[in-house]
Amino acid sequence: MTMLQVHGAQIPCKGILFDIDGTLLEFLQLWGPWAETLLNQLQTRMNELGASFTVELEHVLGTIHNEQGHIVGYDPQGPLAIATVDECTGLLAGQLYAAGMPWNEAITTIRQFSSVAMREVRQRKLAEPMSGLLDFLQKCRAADIPLAVVTSDSTAAAETHLDWMGIRSFFTSIVGCDRVIKGKPDGEAAFLACRELHIHPGEAVVIGDSNGDMQMGRHAGVSYTLGYCPQLDQGSHLVDAHAIIRHYNEINVSV
């Protein structure tokens, strides 16, 4: 059986389920501008309503801002990192509702803001693969390990971002939030991905940058949950990971 070698551990592996944002691609490069555009539009509308956020700006989506107001980081346990687009929409609409806007108008307004922000994302196409990822994907292909993406984003968006990076062909299954009833941290998406890879969940490994990924894997009964965190001073949030890597070159594949 094919084995993954991580920090001395030998892990039997018949398939790998990857998160995408922050795991396959540079999260902030793609989603930072989206969140910044969205929050700026929301701030302007709140000002027009004579209202302010119910929490500090940083806590609305879980973002970190510099003195100029630009997003320079994010909370790996926050909504921006983990929530689905629909969940973020509801969260932001709640701010407008609290400011006095009817709920239906608040939802419509946030969807319009999100469309503007997504248009900018599509124009920029700032999706870059994580360092060492391509080499690891090629090793998996050489070892005939089937791969899947399991994401809180939509399936179509995930496929688009994989295309931008030129790595779509590596993945047999793409499971977005629109293909399941319960998203992460529930195990439903992992079960579906494993069925499409024709493997048992107990033969799969999950790789992700949020603890929601790790919990999804454990709920599905996968053999190993591998946390990915390039920042050397971070990673404490990955409490349900069996192990944490900082770079893809820390994983060896043997047949």
Model region roles, listed by residue range:
Residues M1-I16, T44-R45, L134-A142, T155-V255:
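Asp-based, Mg2+/Mn2+-dependent phosphohydrolase catalytic module
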Residues I11-S131:
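N-terminal helical cap/lid subdomain that shapes the substrate entry/recognition surface
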Residues L17-I20, D144-A148:
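Short glycine-rich or small-residue beta-strand-to-loop segments that form or flank ligand, phosphate
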Residues T23, T151-D153:
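Conserved phosphate-coupling serine/threonine residues in phosphotransfer and NTP-handling enzymes
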Residues T84, E128, V150, I181-K182, ...:
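Residues that cap or flank secondary-structure elements
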Residues Q123-R124, L137, I145:
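Compact structured core domains
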